[in-house]
Amino acid sequence: MLRATALHEWLMTPTVAQDVSTRTREPQHWAALGALGIVYGDLGTSPLYTLQTVVQATGGHFTTASALGILSLLVWTLIITISIKYCLFVMRADNHGEGGILALMSLVGANRFKGTAKILAVMGLLGAALLYGDGVITPAISVLSALEGVNVVTGSLKPFVMPAAVAILIVFFAAQRFGTARIGAAFGPIMLLWFLVIAVLGLTGIVRNPSVLTALDPRHAIGFLAHSGGNGMLVLGGVFLCITGGEALYADMGHFGPGPIRLSWYAIVLPSLLLSYAGQTALLIQKGTIEGNPFFQLCPTWGVYPLVFLAMIATIIASQSIITGSFSMTRQAMQLGWLPGFHIRQTSDKVYGQIYVPVVNWMMMVATIGITIAFGSSDRLAGAYGTAVSTTMLLTTCLLFTAMRKTWRWPLAVSILIAGLFLIVDVGFFGANLLKIAEGGWLPLTFGALVFFLMLTWRSGIDAVRESLAQASEAPERFVADLAAGKVPRVPGTAIFLTRTYQKIPPLLIDHVKHMGALHQSVIALTILFEESPRIDDEERCGVEKIADGIWRVTMRFGFVEIPDLTAALKRVKGLDPSIDLDHAIYFATRDIIVARAGSSLFAHWRLPVFAFLYRNAVKVVDRFSLPPDRVVEIARQIEL
């Protein structure tokens, strides 16, 4: 009884993230409208290609019973995976208001990458890396499926669909550097119009054949799987496309909070999707067999071109949400120490989450356009879609089980029961998507595996750098003794030494004195730490320790979603000498050169060149930490690994 009561209290207690709309003083219904434009682009445009893909998996011919079984699978996939798993459980696993698989990984303590936490870290990193894999396919399949709607009216435009898609994608990626601050406010209303249109179109199909509503009975889905044999797995692979955008609910939780995201899902998105799929199924039953896309065939001929235009806008919005999510996930991975520092530009001075990461943008553009040209159509591309995100959803469930046990302290039986239900569904879809590997499913898996390799290589290399610096540094006691004895000449001014190490006297400071023969009158040895929490309160941000006359050791902590401004943060530090002149301080940083040590480990032989390349091309400290470039001195240093 006590355990049941505790679970009830957990379900009824608001999370930190539910206060997001309250903190911004934005009414929940307006926040829900905003969520339509950011969170539900991918899920909302899935009716463009999902049922078409399923129809192809069945060979284009099916009975009324099989059509109802497929619709029932779509209905209950949306209910179990999105309505229950993500809306009720996964979104409860907020990391101080932030969501996403990397935030979940940090919540369960996997970012330490030690002991058994390594397994959880691998799950989180692999899940995040695979999202990049499907992220390069989403814009391609969405834009192609929208443009292919013109084939319903005339086949003469078919040769121009792929070139037009490539042109649109080039403009789309090229425009990312300008941000979406000015037009982003229109995303929500446009997607609201989209959902209303697909709901009305679905209703027109249902009116012709109301019997499709019986698909709400899950026995239709169970019966279909029981009697479809091996073809059922192929159909499941197509059905999965209706939820490929499910991770966005969790990833964008920090922007809107669970409340508005749930409100828009239950009130608008879910009913519209169900009506659209039901209407398309009614059309399939009516015709018995169908060629082309049932989504556009629901529309009267006079409305196809306007619908194609609206679908084009909706798919661009869906692609925008994928790109924005990739930028945000890249920043999280950087702050948590899993990726090198990339140049990040804030594209809005009002909305924190609107950022632009050039290297990610151009890499995704090249991959997306290459995929569009290679596959040429949405039906061929559907074979490559879903393999990566199905793996991510499976890994999310595994991490969710860990959160149930470690964070929420749930009983083992309850955790197994709930996570086990989700695992059954996830494993089923995972197995179905494995059948797509030969049809192109290898592509997002390979792309994700490459990102995963880069993440592990970077983290291993950075840990090796810290260990090498710690072993090579001189004893700080001798340096402090020389300072106390007046053996180190002091010159006027303030110097701030940026260091990765945690020693009280960092090697950079000692090397500076050794080569220059003097030290500034006021010195700050500064280490920047990125914590597993998304944000750090100002009163907890800095730790200050005076270690010698005129020398302070400062440790500054930031959350993994924060953009550090060191100059501004240092001015708020308490415990420093008031005479320190931060406005004219000189910042000292290193520009390290990575080389292989003779007889080094396997890491140096085959991964060191990769790490050295990443290290060499990482963003400079002056750019990452908003330092004044005319007051930064970089010192070259060779590090053997």
Curated annotation (Swiss-Prot):
It is found in: Cell inner membrane. The chain crosses the membrane at residues 31-51, 64-84, 119-139, 155-175, 183-203, 221-241, 265-285, 298-318, 355-375, 381-401, 412-432, 437-457. Coiled coil: none annotated. Belongs to the HAK/KUP transporter (TC 2.A.72) family. Transport of potassium into the cell. Likely operates as a K(+):H(+) symporter. HAMAP family: Kup. This is Probable potassium transport system protein Kup 4. It comes from Bradyrhizobium sp. (strain BTAi1 / ATCC BAA-1182). The gene is kup4.
